[in-house]
Amino acid sequence: MSDLTSPSITAVRDLREASCGPIGAPAVTSDLSENVILTSLDDLHNWARLSSLWPLLYGTACCFIEFAALLGSRFDFDRFGLVPRSSPRQADLLIVAGTVTMKMAPALVRLYEQMPEPKYVIAMGACTITGGMFSADSTTAVRGVDKLIPVDLYMPGCPPRPEAIFDAVIKLRKKVGDESLAERRKHVQTHRYFTVSHQMKRVEEQVTGSYLRAETQKAALAAAPAGQTLATDAAVLTPALEAVES
């Protein structure tokens, strides 16, 4: 029979008495280091924007029906701080859901231009991204909305599920959180909209195609420039039976 005064039982009793007692009031400190939160202007600005995205819903086909399911209580669309707006001047997120035709293209571009900066675009569904099934034989469907306006996030599917829309919103929030106020100067006007000016650098070609112009692989090895290493095994140095067309 175990001893009732063992240290383990005593510790359990002390813990029970301490947990059943009244909770003491936390000590309020006046130390400045414990009452100040240090952050940057970029983090504060991005936190305010990513927590209150106001989307403009541009639905033209069946993908918009899946988006309408988010407005119900099952998926709780409002928990991300998204407030649908009916005016492009009050929105900073444009969600294009459905097929875009040549006739609707000017209206879509006009809505995008009326949105204030900074603004973002989500392409929802296969018809919005590539034209979908209408791109095969239709002469009026736009083969990708990115030919009209810049797209920040592509959401494939026919149609995408409501969970995919949540995933797209979360990824867009991460993108907004990584932005900097200093990078706004990189946005320049190209064509009819503002986008990031990509600085492309031309690099040296790695595949020159000399092996296609040589009659044999031995000739290609002899014609190789100085410093370029080629395979020198027996299979490579065997002359080809047929001449390679240039």
UniProtKB/Swiss-Prot annotation:
Query: Which keywords does this Swiss-Prot/TrEMBL entry list?
Result: 4Fe-4S, Iron, Iron-sulfur, Membrane, Metal-binding, NAD, NADP, Plastoquinone, Quinone, Thylakoid, Translocase, Transport
Cofactor stoichiometry and binding?
Binds 1 [4Fe-4S] cluster.
Any one of the GO CC terms: respiratory chain complex I
Stated membrane topology is:
Peripheral membrane protein
Where is [4Fe-4S] cluster bound in this sequence? 62-63, 127, 158
Q: Which PANTHER family match?
A: NADH DEHYDROGENASE (PTHR11995), NADH DEHYDROGENASE [UBIQUINONE] IRON-SULFUR PROTEIN 7, MITOCHONDRIAL (PTHR11995:SF14)
What job does this protein perform? NDH-1 shuttles electrons from an unknown electron donor, via FMN and iron-sulfur (Fe-S) centers, to quinones in the respiratory and/or the photosynthetic chain. The immediate electron acceptor for the enzyme in this species is believed to be plastoquinone. Couples the redox reaction to proton translocation, and thus conserves the redox energy in a proton gradient. Cyanobacterial NDH-1 also plays a role in inorganic carbon-concentration.
Q: Could you describe the subunit structure of this protein?
A: NDH-1 can be composed of about 15 different subunits; different subcomplexes with different compositions have been identified which probably have different functions.
Write down what this protein is called.
NAD(P)H-quinone oxidoreductase subunit K
Gene that specifies this protein: ndhK
